[in-house]
Amino acid sequence: MNVFCLGLSHHTAAVSLRECFAVGGDESATVTNDLRAAAGLTEVVLLSTCNRVEIYGAAVDPSAAMEFASSFLQCRAGRTADFARYEGAAAVQHLFRVASGLDSMVLGETEILGQVKDAYAAAFGAGHTGPALNRLFQHAFRAAKQVRTESEIGRGAVSVGSAAARLAASALGDLAACRALLLGAGEAGEDVARSLHSRGLMELLVANRTSTRAEALAAGLGGRAVEFAHWRDHLATADIVIACADAPSRLLRAAELAPFLAVREGRPLFLLDLAVPRDFDPAIRALSGATLHDIDALEAVAREGESLRAAEVAKAEAIIAGQVAEFVRRGADRPTLAVAA
């Protein structure tokens, strides 16, 4: 079996390191092409999300390929990292667990399956997959579906948005007296907005580069859309600022925030940065009057209640074990009709 996985996740690296290795959607094709050539991979799929950056590949010599891939990624990032490495059946098990939400920060969440499917579809469309990875990923999707239908791993799970709202409430108390400014109106932003609204938020302001998305999200929750170019104008009056805008560079630096804090008359400002790479300057933590958290702060909140789902986790893990055994038994090198999920 010549498949492998190499990468970083929230289990092994803080966001300060993960963001250095993150690959944005606009650069994914170029990075994948360069990686495949540099590491001598016969097949490759690149998965980059807020909580993980992973390379799934097939090569004649997986160990050597992982060394080349590791060197390529570290050279590109300008940072060193201790990558997790999986080969053969271990790589199969890891992908099946990832696709099923068993390896997620929010245990049992379903967004990761869509992200894995998107990563595979992009690689498939670019001709980067072949018999080994086509079969591996198609089986992973079946395993994830079985976990979803035969276990209740997702029941009672908190979403990223609900964890964010819970963290804000723990810092500020009753959100009915709070005004929130949300940067980004994508799936994550919508999840956050709905979770804040469900906790009785006094007012929601939404800023997004595409104004129509901000307007639609705000209108659906009784909020107000603000121009993305002028969102900083609301820093003096907002109580909560949450970023998930996937910006190409920092949206807010400490020096930019300081003047707004000076006119807040001691009112605390809660900032939460859910983006990877991060949208807010980490130096903001040193400013008096502001509290800044990043996505890693959600892990403790997301883990609450997991003990109540222990039986479902065990059931899901048993399903994965059975699917891995079936995959190995049938042989990883047998060609499969290539059909994108």
Regions found by a protein language model. Give the residues of each.
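Adenosine-phosphate binding glycine-rich loop
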Residues: 19-26, 258-341
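Rossmann-like NAD(P)-binding element
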Residues: 223-257, 262-272, 276-277
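A glycine-rich (often HGG/GG-containing) alpha/beta subdomain
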Residues: 1-107
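Internal alpha-helical scaffold of NAD(P)-dependent oxidoreductase catalytic cores
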Residues: 63, 67-80, 124-128, 134-143, ...
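N-terminal loops that bind phosphate or other acidic moieties
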Residues: 10-12, 16-29, 188-194, 198-200, ...
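Short active-site oxyanion
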Residues: 43, 201-205, 267-270
